[in-house]
Amino acid sequence: ASVVAGIRDRAPDARILVVGYPQIVPQGKESCDALPLAAGDLPFARTVNEGLADALAEGARRAKAEHVDVYALTEGHDICSDDPWIAGRDTVPGQALAFHPFAAEQQAVAEEILRILRD
Protein backbone atom coordinates (compact mmCIF):
# COMPACT_ATOMS: atom_id res chain seq x y z
CA ALA A 1 0.00 0.00 0.00
CA SER A 2 2.88 2.40 0.69
CA VAL A 3 4.24 1.91 -2.83
CA VAL A 4 0.85 2.75 -4.32
CA ALA A 5 0.58 5.76 -1.99
CA GLY A 6 3.99 6.95 -3.19
CA ILE A 7 2.89 6.65 -6.80
CA ARG A 8 -0.32 8.55 -6.04
CA ASP A 9 1.68 11.33 -4.36
CA ARG A 10 3.90 11.74 -7.41
CA ALA A 11 1.25 11.13 -10.06
CA PRO A 12 -2.20 11.83 -8.61
CA ASP A 13 -3.98 11.18 -11.91
CA ALA A 14 -2.17 7.92 -12.68
CA ARG A 15 -4.07 4.72 -13.25
CA ILE A 16 -2.29 2.19 -11.04
CA LEU A 17 -2.25 -1.53 -11.75
CA VAL A 18 -0.77 -4.07 -9.37
CA VAL A 19 0.40 -7.12 -11.30
CA GLY A 20 -0.33 -10.31 -9.39
CA TYR A 21 1.62 -13.51 -8.84
CA PRO A 22 1.42 -16.53 -11.18
CA GLN A 23 0.50 -20.13 -10.46
CA ILE A 24 3.77 -21.93 -9.98
CA VAL A 25 2.84 -25.02 -7.99
CA PRO A 26 0.61 -27.66 -9.61
CA GLN A 27 -2.86 -28.26 -8.24
CA GLY A 28 -2.43 -32.02 -8.40
CA LYS A 29 -0.89 -34.27 -5.80
CA GLU A 30 2.32 -34.96 -7.68
CA SER A 31 5.34 -32.82 -8.38
CA CYS A 32 7.78 -33.16 -11.27
CA ASP A 33 11.52 -33.00 -11.90
CA ALA A 34 11.29 -29.26 -12.57
CA LEU A 35 9.75 -28.73 -9.11
CA PRO A 36 11.44 -31.29 -6.86
CA LEU A 37 9.13 -31.34 -3.85
CA ALA A 38 7.90 -34.31 -1.89
CA ALA A 39 4.19 -35.03 -2.37
CA GLY A 40 3.59 -34.12 1.26
CA ASP A 41 5.15 -30.69 0.73
CA LEU A 42 3.01 -29.75 -2.27
CA PRO A 43 -0.03 -28.58 -0.27
CA PHE A 44 2.16 -26.22 1.77
CA ALA A 45 3.92 -24.90 -1.35
CA ARG A 46 0.53 -24.42 -3.00
CA THR A 47 -0.70 -22.49 0.05
CA VAL A 48 2.35 -20.22 -0.10
CA ASN A 49 1.80 -19.67 -3.84
CA GLU A 50 -1.88 -18.85 -3.31
CA GLY A 51 -0.99 -16.64 -0.34
CA LEU A 52 1.38 -14.52 -2.41
CA ALA A 53 -1.25 -14.07 -5.09
CA ASP A 54 -3.95 -13.26 -2.53
CA ALA A 55 -1.70 -10.76 -0.71
CA LEU A 56 -1.09 -8.80 -3.91
CA ALA A 57 -4.81 -8.80 -4.74
CA GLU A 58 -5.73 -7.66 -1.24
CA GLY A 59 -3.01 -5.01 -1.24
CA ALA A 60 -4.33 -3.63 -4.52
CA ARG A 61 -7.88 -3.60 -3.16
CA ARG A 62 -6.89 -1.80 0.03
CA ALA A 63 -4.85 0.75 -1.90
CA LYS A 64 -7.72 1.26 -4.36
CA ALA A 65 -5.52 0.20 -7.25
CA GLU A 66 -6.49 -2.17 -10.03
CA HIS A 67 -5.32 -5.76 -9.83
CA VAL A 68 -4.05 -7.85 -12.74
CA ASP A 69 -5.00 -11.42 -11.75
CA VAL A 70 -1.98 -13.29 -13.05
CA TYR A 71 -2.82 -16.28 -10.85
CA ALA A 72 -6.05 -16.93 -12.75
CA LEU A 73 -4.39 -16.05 -16.05
CA THR A 74 -1.68 -18.69 -15.61
CA GLU A 75 -3.98 -21.53 -14.56
CA GLY A 76 -2.91 -24.69 -16.36
CA HIS A 77 0.59 -23.35 -16.97
CA ASP A 78 2.31 -24.19 -13.67
CA ILE A 79 5.86 -25.54 -13.62
CA CYS A 80 4.73 -29.16 -13.97
CA SER A 81 2.13 -28.61 -16.71
CA ASP A 82 2.47 -29.76 -20.30
CA ASP A 83 2.76 -26.08 -21.27
CA PRO A 84 4.64 -24.38 -18.42
CA TRP A 85 4.91 -20.60 -18.43
CA ILE A 86 7.37 -20.64 -15.53
CA ALA A 87 10.79 -22.30 -15.67
CA GLY A 88 11.49 -24.96 -13.09
CA ARG A 89 14.56 -25.42 -10.95
CA ASP A 90 16.91 -25.21 -13.93
CA THR A 91 17.69 -22.08 -15.91
CA VAL A 92 16.74 -22.44 -19.57
CA PRO A 93 19.49 -20.53 -21.41
CA GLY A 94 18.13 -17.75 -23.57
CA GLN A 95 14.59 -18.26 -22.23
CA ALA A 96 14.27 -17.95 -18.46
CA LEU A 97 16.15 -18.14 -15.19
CA ALA A 98 15.14 -20.84 -12.74
CA PHE A 99 11.68 -20.19 -11.28
CA HIS A 100 11.13 -17.19 -13.57
CA PRO A 101 8.56 -16.70 -16.35
CA PHE A 102 8.98 -17.66 -19.97
CA ALA A 103 8.10 -15.22 -22.75
CA ALA A 104 4.65 -16.83 -23.16
CA GLU A 105 3.71 -15.83 -19.60
CA GLN A 106 5.01 -12.31 -20.07
CA GLN A 107 3.09 -11.99 -23.34
CA ALA A 108 -0.13 -13.18 -21.69
CA VAL A 109 0.35 -10.71 -18.82
CA ALA A 110 1.06 -7.86 -21.25
CA GLU A 111 -2.09 -8.67 -23.22
CA GLU A 112 -4.14 -8.75 -20.01
CA ILE A 113 -2.74 -5.38 -18.93
CA LEU A 114 -3.65 -3.91 -22.33
CA ARG A 115 -7.15 -5.38 -22.06
CA ILE A 116 -7.63 -3.79 -18.63
CA LEU A 117 -6.27 -0.42 -19.76
CA ARG A 118 -8.58 -0.37 -22.77
CA ASP A 119 -11.69 -1.05 -20.66
Describe each PLM feature range.
Residues 22-119:
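Catalytic His-Asp segment of secreted/periplasmic serine-dependent ester chemistry enzymes
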Residues 19:
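Active-site rim beta-loop-alpha module in soluble metabolic enzymes
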Residues 11-16, 63-66:
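Loop/turn elements at helix/coil->beta-strand transitions in domains of secreted/extracellular proteins
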